[in-house]
């Protein structure tokens, strides 16, 4: 049975048993600062399990994308060396939220594996927590197993907890015996399904208290059960991985070194799904995890003797293997971006890889099996050459050389601490518990803003102070957050900023709504009491700022047209990476590896404005996620969607979107791109204006053009040619002025002082540019000479020092200039330049003179130096 069929059977089985199918949440967890990546099926239900979030759902089933390659949960180093570890994997799971418990959960599991999958009961065994007599007896009744097949485990392996406190409970694991005597024990008998019975709440003292609602959380690794169903002992022999490995073997022309091929297949799969969610290679956080995956795979590709980029060539096999699943659709939509990113990162890493491998070979030349590589050496590779530690460890493992982890950690020091602070967790702000409490108490806010701009009878359900404390009332001047039973105010989400407006009581008390946010469909009206007072339970007339809302509608619809147009002109690899829909502008970040040309920007502008002039109708409809995707709707990577989604259709553009939009594109008016720039590797940004803001922008540019035309004394149509002529004339004038400066410099009465065979030449130039003086200094080639010139122009003084080449082994220009201005300066032994205080020129020159005098070239011969003002004349240079 193939992997895709197992997934489909699992979902169908539990849907037929009254479970609601829930789509996989993104790999990037939402509102959870404790996790870098989603690493289990229960992550998206965590707040339901803890009671922080209410739900009408009683039962759920999902196939969850998981990644364990960073943060606390990291299987990266095990991948390739074991039969069952992966960085990316799918977790099949069924969940109960206060509905069924142990007996039903065990019945479901037993029925699925023995009837749906027809597994041989004789190859199965069960573990339970040693004090969980209930689970033990249920298993005996349902399976008919004797006591030797139901094993009591005393360790915490069979007691699961969400953290040091909170929901927890015993668990029961189902194991499968592959049966081959040639397998090691850990590979022969494998866990295929874990059933967690959440029935306790652990307090800070470690005491267990019964939960009011008992829950079920199960997890079965899809790859592991696929290995069982396909009668293979290694997860990498299942249909998905065998196809990827066959293709890498075909390209590399080598079938040996199974470890390398496993790593390539696993890391390609993980990298592809990360890129599909909008993660791109970088040096911090999740971006760095992606970079590590690609670079580690690249190292093994080169180890197999393939010296070209390979991952993007194998990627189509991954698409073919997963295309029947919804997750495969993600890869199809992001195909161009994934291939481009993989190829680019591989090629960029080639030089670093070869340099790093060569240096590591040097570091380990004199080391033999059992020796230890100093941590400082590994850190040098990592810090100076950008060579990943993972690859260093892989090479050492192959050579059976130990690694000095402590030495590496010590060398990393503060730098490592800073890096860890940046990538530990998702970086998102945690959501205050007060909002979850209010959601549980009042449920979702009813949003009526699609149909109405105001409601006259909104009831105040709760008032929260600026300290996030629930209060009964607020008076004039206080800043508060108000929860209404229904609202026309759009809560900030999907890139669109929140609405503003007012709440007015019957006694004419006025509350200004300064912003609106949203937490799990609870709308937070950020307010200030402008006049009067407000109390919990009051009824208010809630009105949005209609004119501001209309500008948001224009900009949001224009963003959809821009996205659609970019994909038409640049290609299907373009996907949204971020956006801002504000009243005065829109900003759109998208995947694209190169700067757009001016012609491309004009084409985009023209196409968007053409769609606006067509006055296309904008429509919305609610439909299932799968149906929306099948009809071509764009889902934004990283966003979490429910089973029912809102689709906004404007012409041929279809996007999943909860924002507000115009009814017809003609309302947008004019669309004008202001800037196009780079945000990060592979991500571009367009900022644009619509409506009156766009007209104002064009008008301002027209006014400025007319001012320029008046200044250069030419018609607007001839500004370019006139400026070209003026530029040429300016260059000629600059050349003439520079030549005049050179003559002035040459005409200066520059003196030199001899210090025991060394010519010390110093002079201060006034009102002559430093670049002219520098050029003059560079032309001086007299041997055994030290030059110290200062140039003062427009209250800025520059010191330039040059030492002739025959002296630089004994006297350094960089050292002299640092002594002169009493600070560390740049430059080199022959030439150095820095700014200095015009009032301390004499002190600087004196310091240089003293240093030359004190050098080993000098004797006890002393005389009055010529650089002092009023000094005796020395010989001319």
From Swiss-Prot:
Cellular compartments annotated: Cytoplasm
Example of a GO cellular component annotation carried by this entry: cytosol
EC number: 6.1.1.7
Alphabetical list of CDD domains matching this protein: AlaRS_core (cd00673)
Chief location category: cytoplasm
Binding site for Zn(2+): 556, 560, 657, 661
Keywords for this protein: Aminoacyl-tRNA synthetase, ATP-binding, Cytoplasm, Ligase, Metal-binding, Nucleotide-binding, Protein biosynthesis, RNA-binding, tRNA-binding, Zinc
Protein name (Swiss-Prot/TrEMBL): Alanine--tRNA ligase
């Amino acid at each position: 049975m193939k992997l895709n069929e197992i997934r489909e059977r699992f979902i169908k089985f539990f849907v037929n048993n009254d479970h609601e199918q829930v789509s996989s949440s993104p790999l990037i967890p939402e509102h959870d600062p404790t996790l870098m990546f989603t690493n289990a099926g229960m992550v998206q239900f965590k707040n339901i399990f803890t009671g922080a979030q209410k739900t009408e759902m009683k039962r759920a089933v999902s196939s969850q994308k998981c990644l364990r390659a960073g943060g606390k949960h990291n299987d990266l180093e095990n991948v390739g060396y074991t039969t069952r570890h992966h960085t990316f994997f799918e977790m099949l799971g069924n969940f109960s939220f206060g509905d069924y418990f142990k007996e039903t959960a065990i019945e479901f599991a037993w029925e699925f594996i023995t009837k749906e999958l027809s597994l041989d009961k004789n190859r199965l065994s069960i573990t339970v927590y040693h004090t969980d007599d209930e689970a033990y007896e249920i298993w005996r009744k349902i399976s008919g197993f004797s006591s030797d097949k139901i094993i009591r485990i005393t360790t915490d392996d069979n007691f699961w907890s969400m953290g040091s406190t909170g929901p927890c409970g015993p668990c029961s694991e189902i194991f499968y015996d592959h049966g081959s005597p040639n397998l090691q024990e850990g590979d022969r008998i494998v866990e295929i399904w874990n059933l967690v019975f959440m029935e306790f709440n652990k307090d800070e003292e470690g005491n267990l208290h019964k939960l009011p609602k008992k829950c079920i959380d199960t997890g079965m690794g899809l790859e592991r059960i696929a290995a069982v169903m396909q009668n293979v002992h290694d997860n990498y022999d299942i249909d998905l991985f065998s196809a990827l490995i066959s293709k890498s073997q075909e390209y590399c022309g080598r079938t040996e070194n199974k470890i390398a091929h496993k790593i390539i297949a696993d890391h390609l799969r993980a990298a592809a799904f990360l890129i599909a969610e909008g993660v791109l290679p970088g040096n911090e956080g999740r971006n760095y995890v992606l970079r590590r995956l690609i670079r580690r795979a690249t190292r093994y590709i080169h180890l197999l003797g393939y010296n070209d980029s390979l991952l993007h060539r194998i990627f189509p096999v991954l698409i073919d293997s997963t295309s029947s699943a919804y997750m495969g659709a993600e890869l199809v939509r992001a195909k161009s971006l994934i291939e481009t990113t993989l190829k680019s990162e591989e090629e960029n890493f080639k030089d670093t890889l070869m340099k790093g491998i060569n240096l590591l070979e040097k570091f380990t030349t004199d080391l033999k099996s059992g020796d230890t590589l100093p941590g400082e050496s590994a850190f040098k590779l990592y810090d100076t050459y950008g060579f990943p530690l993972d690859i260093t460890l892989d090479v050492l493992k192959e050579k059976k050389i130990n690694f000095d982890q402590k030495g590496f950690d010590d060398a990393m020091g503060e730098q490592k601490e800073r890096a860890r602070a940046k990538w530990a967790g998702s970086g998102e702000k945690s959501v205050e518990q007060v909002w979850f409490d209010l959601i549980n108490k009042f449920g979702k806010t009813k949003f009526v803003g699609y149909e109405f701009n105001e409601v006259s009878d909104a009831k105040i359900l709760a008032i929260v102070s600026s300290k996030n404390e629930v209060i009964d009332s607020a008076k004039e001047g206080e800043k508060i957050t108000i929860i209404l039973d229904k609202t026309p105010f759009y809560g900030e989400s999907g890139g669109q900023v929140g609405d503003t407006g007012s709440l007015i009581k019957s006694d004419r008390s006025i509350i200004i709504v300064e912003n609106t946010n949203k937490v799990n469909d609870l709308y937070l009206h950020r307010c200030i009491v402008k006049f009067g007072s407000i109390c919990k339970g009051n009824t208010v007339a809630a009105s949005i700022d209609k004119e501001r809302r209309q500008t948001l509608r224009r900009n949001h619809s224009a963003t959809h047209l821009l996205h659609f147009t970019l994909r038409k002109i640049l290609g299907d690899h373009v996907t949204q990476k971020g956006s801002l829909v504000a009243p005065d502008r829109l900003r759109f970040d998208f995947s694209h590896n190169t700067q757009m040309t001016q012609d491309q920007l004009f084409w985009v502008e023209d196409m968007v404005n053409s769609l606006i002039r067509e006055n296309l109708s904008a429509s919305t409809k609610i439909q299932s996620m799968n149906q929306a995707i099948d009809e071509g709707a764009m889902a934004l990577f990283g966003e979490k969607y429910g089973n029912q989604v809102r689709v906004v259709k404007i012409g041929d553009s279809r996007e999943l979107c909860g924002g507000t939009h115009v009814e017809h594109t003609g309302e947008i008016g004019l669309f004008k791109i202001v800037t196009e720039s780079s945000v990060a590797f592979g991500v571009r940004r367009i900022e644009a204006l619509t409506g009156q803001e766009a007209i104002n922008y064009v008008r301002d540019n027209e006014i400025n053009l007319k001012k320029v035309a008046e200044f250069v004394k030419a018609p607007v149509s001839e500004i370019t040619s006139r400026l070209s002529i003026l530029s040429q004339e300016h260059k000629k004038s600059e050349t003439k002025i520079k030549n005049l400066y050179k003559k002035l410099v040459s005409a200066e009465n520059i003196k030199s002082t001899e210090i025991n065979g060394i010519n010390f030449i110093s002079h201060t130039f006034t009102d002559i540019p430093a670049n002219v003086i520098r050029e003059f200094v560079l032309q001086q080639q007299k041997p055994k000479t030290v030059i110290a010139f200062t140039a003062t122009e427009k209250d800025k003084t520059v010191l330039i020092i040059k030492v002739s080449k025959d002296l630089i082994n004994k006297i350094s220009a960089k050292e002299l200039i640092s002594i002169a201005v009493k600070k560390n300066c740049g430059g080199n032994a022959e030439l150095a330049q820095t700014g200095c205080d015009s009032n301390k020129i004499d002190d600087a020159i004196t310091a240089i003179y003293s240093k030359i005098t004190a050098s080993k070239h000098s004797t006890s011969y002393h005389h009055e130096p010529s650089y002092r003002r009023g000094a005796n004349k020395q010989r001319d240079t």
